[in-house]
């Protein structure tokens, strides 16, 4: 662990979901330019001392701040070229905005591992969009689209996390997946 530099970044407290069990207040607060500059200074000072640098994107919902994610990732990729450390990145996301186009941009930025939570058949009740509409089908469509990417070109990992809630009694969900 002495050779690994891991930074967890929360580009926004905002989220496009309104999960009733969430602990976040959903303030639409995002990183300021000053914060981004300080992150760049910090990573630039620290990264060359390590053999591996890992960025972990968290939120709120990090896909809402695509430009921030891409900017910081680009900084680390440039440092990687200069200093030769191994770079890896992961993201915890609700998966709603993770379509083909955004995934490809993030992939080029070195983000190759994702964690997406799905609440089974109750998902649309427990993980509704800020508009109140369901989100499950969009996420499933995104995942299906990503699963068709050519493995020779795209080596990535998605962990699907499933919250099992008190009233979950229909386990056919696992067959559906």
Regions found by a protein language model. Give the residues of each.
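Canonical Radical SAM [4Fe-4S] cluster-binding loop centered on the CxxxCxxC motif
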Residues: 2-34
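Short, solvent-exposed beta-strand edge segments and adjacent coil->beta transition regions
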Residues: 4-6, 59, 155-157
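Short acidic donor-binding/metal-coordinating loop in glycosyltransferase active sites
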Residues: 11, 59-60
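Residues that line or immediately flank small-molecule/substrate-binding pockets and catalytic motifs
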Residues: 26, 59, 118
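Acidic metal-phosphate-binding loop of nucleotide-sugar-dependent transferases
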Residues: 29, 61-62, 95-96
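Radical SAM/AdoMet-radical enzyme domain recognition
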Residues: 40-56, 65-177
């Amino acid at each position: 662990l002495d050779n690994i530099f891991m930074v967890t970044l929360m580009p926004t407290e905002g989220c496009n979901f309104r999960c009733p069990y969430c602990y976040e207040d959903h303030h639409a607060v995002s990183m300021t330019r000053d914060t981004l500059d300080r992150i760049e200074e910090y990573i630039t000072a620290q990264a060359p001392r390590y053999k591996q640098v890992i960025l972990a994107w968290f939120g709120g919902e990090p896909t809402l701040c695509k430009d921030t994610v891409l900017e910081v990732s680009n900084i680390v990729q440039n440092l990687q070229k200069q200093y030769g450390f191994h770079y890896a990145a992961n993201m915890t996301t609700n998966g709603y905005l993770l379509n083909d186009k955004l995934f490809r941009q993030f992939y080029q930025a070195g983000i190759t591992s994702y964690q997406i939570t799905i609440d089974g058949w109750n998902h649309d009740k427990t993980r509704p969009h800020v508009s109140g509409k369901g989100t499950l089908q969009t996420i499933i469509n995104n995942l299906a689209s990503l699963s068709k990417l050519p493995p020779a070109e795209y080596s990535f990992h998605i962990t699907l996390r499933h919250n099992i809630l008190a009233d979950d009694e229909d386990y056919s969900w696992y067959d559906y997946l």
